[in-house]
Amino acid sequence: MSDLCGGLPPDICEQLTKEEQFIKIKVEKRRYGKEVTIVEGISNDETELKKIASELKSKLAAGGTVKNGKIELQGDHRDRVKELLIKMGFPESNILVIE
């Protein structure tokens, strides 16, 4: 990551990266009427996605996974996910909740 930030301190670099991301949160119906919350657009870094997914699953008490660069959480958690992402430092203006 230091290569991308041109010598900026890591915390400033991390904040800049979060501000550049446009995040979409939506719910899909799967088999047997089960709902899955999809969070996309966060990061292309698999380890970063897994870390965020783990924190979301823990806070929401829900199962989930990371697939194809997206976080999938069991159940409809759109509004709560948005709140948690804002607390993690993502700007509210870059988070779109699709109804």
From Swiss-Prot:
InterPro entries: DENR/SUI1_TIF (IPR050318), SUI1 (IPR001950), SUI1_arc (IPR022851), SUI1_arc_bac (IPR005872), SUI1_dom_sf (IPR036877). Pfam families: SUI1. Transmembrane segments: none annotated. Keywords: Protein biosynthesis, Translation regulation. It comes from the Archaea. GO terms for molecular function: mRNA binding; translation initiation factor activity. The keyword Protein biosynthesis applies. CDD domains: YciH_like. Disulfide bonds: none annotated. One of its GO terms (biological process) is translation reinitiation. Belongs to the SUI1 family. NCBIfam families: PRK00939.1 (NF002096), SUI1_rel (TIGR01158). This is Protein translation factor SUI1 homolog. It comes from Sulfolobus acidocaldarius (strain ATCC 33909 / DSM 639 / JCM 8929 / NBRC 15157 / NCIMB 11770).
